[in-house]
């Protein structure tokens, strides 16, 4: 029967109608499909929600194999039976990954904090920590005096607008390669760094490379514009790498407070759309880190349950916006945060001081680089 090629009323309790025309297919609002509900479900149930969405929107079965899966990794050779664990792809020159750092440049970032015993503005601390992490990423790419292209890295600053945050020769660029970063430093500064010695941990002055600069001139915190820019960059990156088994890109958003200029629902929808983007190895990971100068406020990092947030409205908003981390991250969370609990953690931090921010950045930058490729 011709009708058996399509979803019928028996396929779902909601009573989908027969509909195999292109007009039926065009009725689907895919942004609505990427609803909060999908990400709130346990991982083992997400595929059933996906199937119900496809069926009740009258999609002809012949089209289903060509539709994005809203969260389930698609194998690079779909006609072959494969068993694949997400977030296990090796990072190589042929299968790179990407990092996007989003940095709040609003005026409140001029408040003071302490980084390794040195007083400075939160903007300066955030810039130093991001520069430190970028430098670490570049160092991971150096093999036998060769800088290998394992990563594409972008930094987006935001206040009233969102823009490329690179300085110097890279100014105005979006994604740049590790080799370009090594060859185009903006400037070098002397900072303090903890060093382990036989006498214990000591703080020494060391020279550090900078690619971005502290900025707290903005009046607003328009994170929705930063998310829009990040989505555009990732869309282009995904199109370039869609046939490869690439480790999913990571977005790390650092802010000191509430965003403004857009509703909570709108920003949450943007976050869900970013999290719904995927490679053949899994979905994009979105970290949201609330950076503070208050040592007296309890810091919350990578919680498992909302109950840990003490009914903090802002923390609960970040919880909903942030990715549910794969269990492979648990070892890093245990190492950095001394949190040995089983379960899936959220990629978030609230009231994070400079030390906690460093730890969260370390968790957010995976190290599964191939040693030979």
Place the predicted regions along the sequence by residue.
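Short beta-strand-loop
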Residues: 146-209, 297-308
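Active-site-proximal loop/hinge segments that shape catalytic or ion-binding/gating pockets
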Residues: 2-78
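DG-centered beta-turn motif at the end of beta-strands
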Residues: 101-106, 126, 230-231, 247-264
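P/S/T/G-enriched low-complexity
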Residues: 80-96, 144-148, 241-249, 258-373
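Phosphate/oxyanion-binding active-site loops and adjacent basic polyanion-contact surfaces
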Residues: 95, 119-130, 215-230, 263, ...
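Von Willebrand factor
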Residues: 178-246, 285-297
């Amino acid at each position: 029967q011709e009708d058996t090629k399509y979803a019928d009323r028996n396929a779902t309790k909601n009573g989908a109608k027969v509909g195999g025309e292109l007009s039926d297919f065009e009725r689907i609002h895919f942004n609505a499909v990427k609803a909060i509900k999908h990400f709130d479900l346990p991982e083992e149930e997400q595929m059933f929600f996906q199937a119900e969405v496809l069926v009740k929107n009258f999609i002809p079965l012949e089209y289903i194999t060509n539709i994005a899966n809203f969260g389930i990794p698609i194998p690079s050779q779909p006609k072959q039976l494969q068993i694949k664990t997400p977030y296990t792809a090796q990072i190589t020159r042929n299968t790179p990954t990407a990092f996007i750092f989003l940095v709040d440049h609003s005026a409140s970032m001029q408040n003071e904090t302490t980084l390794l015993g040195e007083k400075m503005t939160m903007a300066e601390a955030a810039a130093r920590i991001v520069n430190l992490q970028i430098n670490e990423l570049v160092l991971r790419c150096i093999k036998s005096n060769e800088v290998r292209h394992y990563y594409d890295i972008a930094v987006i600053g935001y206040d009233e607008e969102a823009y490329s945050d690179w300085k110097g020769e890279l100014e105005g660029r979006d994604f740049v390669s590790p080799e370009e970063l090594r060859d185009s430093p903006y400037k070098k500064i002397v900072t303090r760094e903890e060093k382990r010695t036989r006498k214990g941990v000591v703080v020494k002055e060391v020279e550090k490379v900078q690619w971005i600069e502290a900025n707290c001139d903005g009046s607003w915190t328009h994170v929705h514009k930063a998310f829009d820019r990040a989505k555009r960059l990732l869309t282009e990156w995904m199109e370039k790498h869609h046939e490869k088994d690439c480790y999913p890109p990571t977005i790390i958003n650092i802010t000191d407070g509430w965003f403004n200029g857009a509703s909570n629902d709108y920003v949450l929808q943007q976050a869900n759309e970013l999290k719904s983007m995927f490679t053949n190895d899994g979905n994009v990971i979105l970290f949201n880190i609330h950076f503070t100068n208050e040592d007296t406020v309890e810091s919350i990092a990578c919680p498992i349950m909302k109950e840990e947030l003490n009914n903090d409205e802002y923390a609960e908003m970040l919880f909903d916006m942030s990715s549910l981390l794969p269990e492979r991250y648990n070892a890093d969370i245990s190492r950095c945060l001394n949190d040995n609990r089983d379960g899936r953690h959220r990629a978030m931090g609230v009231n994070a001081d400079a030390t906690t921010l460093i730890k969260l950045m370390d968790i957010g930058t995976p190290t599964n680089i191939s040693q030979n490729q």
